[in-house]
A protein has these predicted regions:
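Feature captures hydrophobic
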Residues: 1-272
């Protein structure tokens, strides 16, 4: 594998660690079956992969993240933990990224026999992440809600980290912008509304949950419903067509909305 390909795989892995893993908090909070399964669970689950030692600051040739579960609460730390209860280790970054994209890749599992119940729960939670895949088109109302909520939360966090990890295109896009808020909001129906935002300021970025209250959004993507958001996310309608059909309305700059949509498409290609 060429160095540029390895760098790309490392960036993708870090985006999974920083943007995809944290959205596991959504099913932990909003999916009754997942919430019940992890009630009372206090454990450390680690994902790791071998890579070129030159890609790691300490020369160890291993990268990873640890998920710390504490009675339904989740903390994700992008580092290797000394005493995890369960380890899913991959022979390469490509193999790990393949599995996290919903493909076939077999990790080496340590602690699975001793903590078999934890392994089953972890695999079930990973299956919830696959709801975000473009090929996953759930019919169940709760799963449709989870798909949209996780996708909106992940993409805003991924955009910020895409910038922080130094992607040239993203860095160029953020570099000369003043303090701006890119807001996303969704009418969640029976499950409740939700929102997330990306803040851009002079090359710096930060993602957050909810409606940003201290500044009017520079661009606001308003999805009228979960079904409307799914129609756009699943590309059942083109973005412009989605506006015409009332699936989404855009307040603010259409030019920058289109540019952000292009960047989101790049990230979707990396993570799904």
């Amino acid at each position: 594998m060429m160095r540029s390909d390895m760098d790309q795989e490392l960036m993708t892995a870090r985006l999974f660690f920083r943007a995809a893993f944290p959205v596991m908090k959504v099913p932990l909070a909003d999916d009754p079956a997942i919430a019940k399964a992890f009630k009372g669970v206090r454990a450390h689950v680690q994902f790791s992969a071998d890579c070129d030692p030159a890609l790691t600051p300490d020369g160890s040739g291993r990268v990873g993240a640890c998920l710390h579960f504490d009675d339904g609460e989740l903390t994700v730390v992008e580092e290797l933990f000394e005493t995890p209860d369960l380890v899913l280790h991959f022979p390469s970054l490509k193999a790990m990224n393949t599995l996290l994209r919903g493909g076939l890749a077999m990790p080496r599992i340590r602690g699975g026999l001793k903590n078999f119940g934890l392994l089953v729960k972890m695999l079930t939670l990973l299956m919830r992440l696959t709801l975000m895949l473009p090929t996953n088109r759930p019919k169940d109302p709760l799963k449709r809600y989870l798909k949209v909520k996780m996708s909106i939360y992940m993409i805003t966090t991924a955009l910020s980290n895409f910038n922080r990890l130094g992607n040239p295109r993203m860095r160029e896009w953020t570099a000369k912008q003043p303090d701006r808020i890119y807001q996303f909001s969704v009418g969640g129906g029976e499950f409740g509304d939700f929102a997330a935002y990306l803040r851009v300021r002079g090359g710096q970025t930060k993602a957050g949950r909810g409606l940003y209250a201290r500044r009017r959004p520079f661009v606001h993507f308003r999805f009228t419903s979960v079904d409307g958001a799914l129609a756009v996310l699943l590309k059942e309608v083109a973005f412009v067509e989605g506006v015409d059909k009332g699936c989404v309305s855009i307040d603010g700059s259409p030019e920058y909305a289109a540019q952000l949509n292009d960047l989101m498409a790049v990230l979707q290609g990396m993570l799904t």
